[in-house]
Amino acid sequence: MEELSMANTMFALNLLKQIEKSNSTQNIFISPWSISSTLAIVLLGAGGNTEQQMAKVLQFNEIGSYGITTRNPENFSGCDFAQQIQKENYPSAILQAQAGDKIHSAFSSLSSTINTPQGDYLLESANKLFGEKSARFKEEYIQLSKKYYSTEPEAVDFLECAEEAREKINSWVKTQTKGEIPNLLPEGSVDEDTKMVLVNAVYFKGKWKTPFEKKLNGLYPFRVNSHESIPVQMMFLHAKLNIGYIKDLKTQILELPHTGNISMLLLLPDEIEDASTGLELLESEINFANFNKWISKDTLDEDDVVVYIPKFKLAQSYELKSILQSMGMEDAFNKGKANFSGMSERNDLFLSEVFHQASVDVTEEGTVAAGGTGAVMTGRTGHGGPQFVADHPFLFFIMDKITHTILFVGRFSSP
């Protein structure tokens, strides 16, 4: 599970960089863990170059002996396995099965740990593969999806009733997220040519370990760039927290713990020193090695900290096809090249789109709460210790500290 968390972190940071390229100044909020686990459901039925590309994008090739395929012994029919032996691939077939079982078993354990709250927080997710009813998913694939991911692909009629299929998918997502995400698929997002769509929606609400002080909250100018400000409701907290400083990037890093195993890590440059959000240098330097160094005990120390951060809610939707293609996952979306032979006997299956939405509330208590209406703030306190004043764009990560998994990553650049 530790190796999988490492792969998920690398995927999360790579995904963030790709999204940043097409969203240089906008708010960002995604759940890379949720996207990765959903794509793994598709990987379970992929083969050949399609599978290799997916494994590489998801960083599974960095884990142990992950090879050409992730198929488990259950995936090989008697004929398939016999053919492997006849081709003198018996040892590699065994290794491939073991590698695949390692990945998918680890996902099963990781999901179970994350979805079993150790504190007062809510994590609602909806992950499912929807395929054209003519696909006729293999029973072996259905059973493995249930075994590892507690879900199974669902057949819908894209060919004759695309709009009804869209409404059915949206209704399912709305139910799974308890009404928080009602319209994941926009109008026109599926049609009669759609073969398979992957949906992934996740909603997080948590309680701060130390709640913010409502009575001291108020309006404060948030600088979206070097020449523009927007009034925003600021939250105030004075508490002992882990805080650090990345000298070469002139960036503060602060840990705000939720109840349980969840923490939010915020990265805030000292000033806006570029022509956009002030985050360009920080975003360019994010990678696996740097991130681990920034959040380590070598960087973070407990101190008496005064904190101002905006109260905000983000609900961001993405169609990830082009982003995943740019990361190297090309064949899965190509009608002529996609290989999903582990899913179906049909050779014309391909992914049409991957829909993702993530939503979060950041309030005084952490969960949805009434806003305070204090006096307008015009300056900072006289506190002699470190201050963390997020009055300009910052990055934030919501992490499960037990599994070291990045559940969410976001950029807050504008109220």
From Swiss-Prot:
Origin superkingdom: Eukaryota
Swiss-Prot/TrEMBL keywords: Cytoplasm, Glycoprotein, Plasminogen activation, Protease inhibitor, Secreted, Serine protease inhibitor, Signal
Location within or outside the cell: Cytoplasm; Secreted, Extracellular space
GO terms (BP aspect): negative regulation of apoptotic process
Keyword Manganese: no
GO molecular function: serine-type endopeptidase inhibitor activity
Cited InterPro entries: PAI-2, Serpin_CS, Serpin_dom, Serpin_fam, Serpin_sf, Serpin_sf_1, Serpin_sf_2
Gene3D superfamilies: Alpha-1-antitrypsin, domain 1, Antithrombin, subunit I, domain 2
PROSITE patterns registered for this protein in UniProt: SERPIN (PS00284)
Site positions per UniProt: Reactive bond: R380, T381
Pfam families: Serpin
Sugar-bearing residue positions: N23, N75, N261, N339
Posttranslational mods: The signal sequence is not cleaved.
One Gene Ontology cellular component annotation held by this UniProt entry: cytoplasm
Keyword Metal-binding in annotation: no
SUPFAM superfamilies named in the record: Serpins (SSF56574)
Protein role: Inhibits urokinase-type plasminogen activator. The monocyte derived PAI-2 is distinct from the endothelial cell-derived PAI-1. Not required for normal murine development or survival.
Assigned protein family: Belongs to the serpin family. Ov-serpin subfamily.
Subunit structure, interactors included: Interacts with PSMB1.
Protein name: Plasminogen activator inhibitor 2, macrophage
Species this protein is from: Mus musculus
Species classification: Eukaryota, Metazoa, Chordata, Craniata, Vertebrata
Record gene name: Serpinb2
